[in-house]
Regions:
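Conserved activation segment of eukaryotic-like protein kinases, specifically the C-terminal portion
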Residues: 54-68
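C-terminal lobe of the eukaryotic/viral protein kinase catalytic domain
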Residues: 96-129
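Catalytic-loop of the protein kinase fold
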Residues: 15-30
Length: 129
C-alpha cells in the first residue's frame, strides 16, 4: 500500500504533474521482488500548473471520486487519492476467500447517489478482521 501511495506521490510532485485518473487494483503490478508499480497510463493527464483544472470524465466507476460526477467536472490530483483508497480497501481483504467491495451490488447511478449524498454503504470489510 505504501508503494502505491509513494508512486502517486511521485506522479503528483513530478514537474509537470501527472494525474493518473484510473488508479485501481488491476492497474497495480507486483514484480517478483514484491514491489508494486502503478501501470496503465492510458487515461493519465499532465497538469501544466498547480492551478490548472482537468475537465473530462474518465476512470472506472467504483474507483471514481465524486468530483468527476458533475456535468462539467473540474478536479485535480486529489481524485487519485480517492481511487487509491478504494484500491487499499481491496488490498485489505487479501486474506478473505470472498471479497466484498465498496458499493458492491449497486449500479452506476446508485453509486453516484450514495457517494454524492454521503450515504456511503460499506461492504462490511471489518466484520472478519
Amino acid at each position: 500500500l505504501l508503494q502505491i501511495a509513494r508512486g502517486l506521490e511521485y506522479l503528483h510532485t513530478h514537474k509537470p504533474m501527472i494525474v493518473h485518473r484510473d488508479c485501481k487494483s488491476t492497474n497495480v503490478l507486483i514484480n517478483a521482488q514484491g514491489i508494486a508499480k502503478i501501470s496503465d497510463f492510458g487515461l493519465a493527464r499532465v497538469k501544466r500548473s498547480k492551478y490548472s483544472i482537468i475537465r473530462s470524465l474518465v476512470g472506472t466507476v467504483n474507483w471514481q471520486a465524486v468530483e468527476l460526477w458533475s456535468p462539467k467536472p473540474q478536479y485535480n490530483e486529489k481524485v487519485d487519492v480517492w481511487s487509491a483508497a478504494m484500491t487499499f480497501w481491496e488490498a485489505l481483504q487479501w486474506h478473505q476467500t470472498e471479497k466484498r467491495y465498496p458499493f458492491q451490488g449497486l449500479n452506476e447511478h446508485q453509486i453516484y447517489m450514495n457517494v454524492r449524498q454521503k450515504h456511503l454503504r460499506y461492504a462490511g470489510i471489518h466484520s472478519n478482521m
